[in-house]
Amino acid sequence: MRNIYHTLLLTGVVLVSPLIVSADSDQTAGDWFKNSYGPLWADTPYQDIEAILTHYHSEIVTHGSDGSLSTTPSREWLTAPMDSWREEGWIRAELTDMTATSINAATTGVMTVWTDYYAGDVTETSCGWYLVDAINNEWKITHYADTPCS
């Protein structure tokens, strides 16, 4: 009887396991962030807005330092700050450090350090936290918070 139970359990696992798939099973959320999302900011982010937007869910939840949460359509969330940064002379950003922490098979937190490049050879460091979720079998950024660079 015990062997039958174990055989049935093993058979069930073998049959069901292909149905349990996280986003893009070929790469982790951290690899996706580092190799797909990060490079889009390195050269011509203004020309790559549509490609950058494919990495976001339709809305982004921003976690404010005052404890507030706000939900914004991703296009507005991305383009409004980019326009403001451009007016300040911002040119591009380079992902210089990153730590990804898997929360579960479908959710990963990503802490980042970026080097921002401005006109006149000025650089600045900025840091942020992103929540990346598997949505419809694709990794998407769903949440963001500025973080102190330490």
Predicted feature residues:
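Short, low-complexity N-terminal intrinsically disordered segments enriched in polar/charged residues
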Residues: 12, 17-54
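Short, well-ordered alpha-helical segments enriched in acidic and aromatic residues
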Residues: 46-63, 72
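Surface-exposed, charged secondary-structure patches
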Residues: 61, 76-120
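Short beta-strand edge/turn micro-motifs at domain boundaries
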Residues: 125-150
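Second-shell loop/turn segments in exported
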Residues: 39-42, 63-68
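A mature extracytoplasmic/lumenal domain signature
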Residues: 56, 66, 104, 112-116, ...
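Bacterial N-terminal signal peptides that target proteins for export
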Residues: 1-8
